[in-house]
Amino acid sequence: MGTLEIKGASLSQFSTGTAQSPWLPLHLWILCSLLAFLPLLVFIGAADCGLIASLLAIYPSWLSARFSVLLFPHWPESCSTKNTARSGALHKPAEQKLRFAQKPCHGNYTVTPCGLLHWIQSPGQL
């Protein structure tokens, strides 16, 4: 008497637990999902003015200015130009660079339920 074959595994293999499932176990799906979204989580988690301005300073000044305006429309001008102004990457007059660099950059971002970043001003800095 033969054994019942189900997608390449016999019934006896299923009863002993030696058959290989074509699907990943749940914990592997969760791990892969977390790894896929890790860069986004790190970027949102590190939504500190100085750190994001440093990351944006890697790009050419015209790209970083447009990039920060598109992503963070409520971001104060001093945050998007803080580090690039000090490095001289912006092609603006020296007095304008100095004005950008001297502006204080206070406050934090928070993630709303819609997933948008909003600038939260410190109470003493309004």
From Swiss-Prot:
Its main location: host cell. The keyword Transmembrane helix applies. Keywords: Host membrane, Host mitochondrion, Host-virus interaction, Membrane, Modulation of host cell apoptosis by virus, Transmembrane, Transmembrane helix. It is found in: Host membrane; Host mitochondrion. GO terms for cellular component: host cell membrane; host cell mitochondrion; membrane. GO terms for biological process: symbiont-mediated perturbation of host apoptosis. It comes from the Viruses. The chain crosses the membrane at residues 24-44. Interacts with host CAMLG; this interaction allows efficient apoptosis inhibition. Additionally, interacts with vGPCR/ORF74 and induces its proteasomeal degradation. Plays a role in the inhibition of host apoptosis to allow completion of the viral lytic replication and may thus favor the maintenance of persistent infection in infected host. This is Protein K7. It comes from Human herpesvirus 8 type P (isolate GK18). The lineage of its organism: Viruses, Duplodnaviria, Heunggongvirae, Peploviricota, Herviviricetes.
